[in-house]
Amino acid sequence: PEYFFASLYVTDWESLFREFERKGNKIDILVSSGGVAPPEVSSPALWNLLINYGPSFPLCALFYNHISSEPYNPIVKRIQGDMHFFLNQWGYYDDEINQFNNALHNIGAGVPPMSYNQIDTDMPAVIVGGGPSFDMRVEEIKRHRDKVLLISCGTSVHSIIAAGLMPDIHVEIESHMLTYDHLSKIDQPEFFENTLLVGALQLPPQVFNLFKHGYYFLKDSTALASMFGTEDEIVHRATPTCTNTGVAVATHLKLKSVFLYGMDFGFPEKNQHHSKNSIYFSDKMSDSIKEGVKRNLEKLVETESVHGDPMYTFPMYNTSRMSIEQLTKHRAIYQKTESYACSEGARIANTEYLTPDAVDDFFTTRKDIASTKFLKALKGTPFTQKQMREKINKLGAFLTEISRSFSVCLNSLKSTEPEDVFRVCHTINLNLLQQVFPKYGLTAYFIRGSIWHYLNIGCAHSLSIENKASRDKFITEWKSNFGKFLEDLPAHYDSITSKQYPDSEDPWVRNDIVSNEHLYAE
């Protein structure tokens, strides 16, 4: 802050601010107190300012560290590293409507929400990911199986069952049909009969249909969260992988002790990226999963193991680990609960690493748990058909309103010059952030991703196409397509949601989003 205070002697900030405001521009000054805060504190504060400047951020982000101040270098580096992740998290309408349709099928079928009002939080939970070190340490889980709540995450369930174990809870997060594909390959009726599915509301309805008992949860940063739940009912940081989901659910339930197995987020050898008994080394692995593994192996990066040794990881695993570290930090600081790392992979911050002997010592005096009572207590009250239809109509009214307001703003664009394109795009973004989000809350996520993608594409090409005739052609077509999207949005939404839920004949729930492309064009 001393730099800013000193600048007051030589800089007339008021005149600068007024000149920027006169042109419709803006300057933000972020002043810290008590010196420069560490990157994990400073970066989010700066980040929350920058994301209000879309599409200029991240498209035109230029970082100038005045007088090369050393404390600011890690802050800038962290934000630069998160920019691509930011772009990949925007989402888009096609995926949102697909998830929403899945959610309506699940609610219409009477799937109840997960509740947590009267549960035993002292119950230790073992949460299992699909990392290769699960094979090394599975025996200690077997020794203490009756003393823990066993939670499988996504594809890790194949390794758990292959080891002769059966989870109490299985968690899933993805709305893609690959979720159904991998679960449908399990030939153990006992799993579907006795294991409780805790899945995101937007799971394909076929997934809930596989299980005798299934409850849904609401993940953060989605329109579904504000439509079908309260803030206290939203599960935070459940993405990007099912492993995150398992830890997020345990954190949401405020379980006092969690043990993280198979959460390696890295591997010592390039061909040891998952447990040997996982679906990734099975002849049942689908072509889609094979292609995904192949692409990931081309983008390996190095990280540090829990023992301080170098190891390999995928960018997605790195992101997943960082997200879990936010959960373990929340558990340690705010919940005063314990997170134990029982994996032999990458180091996970805010956890205590336990050897097999230390795990045995922990459970020596522990008694067997009453998991059945715990699982029954998680069942909430499902929505009625009438309540569901009211939510559908409310979202439809929201889409109609923003379609009109954004169309008016877009039609004010009379030139293809970059400055004019940016001006209109910034106006639309400010409308979204300052008008739509305050009024509709998380519901705005339903359309935010597609709006941001359109704005980013228009501005990026207005800058990159130097030939005026080519730029005129592209921006004119971009404006037309953007306007048509906004115009058709309410009618398309109504065409999808006007059915009676659940509807076994609905083609949307029989394929994944790629296979449904022909339906989006109708």
Model-predicted segments: where are they?
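Glycine-rich phosphate/pyrophosphate-binding loops
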Residues: 156-174, 250-276
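Long alpha-helical, hydrophobic tracts
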Residues: 148-149, 238-241, 274
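Active-site/ligand-binding-proximal alpha/beta "capping" segment
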Residues: 205-265
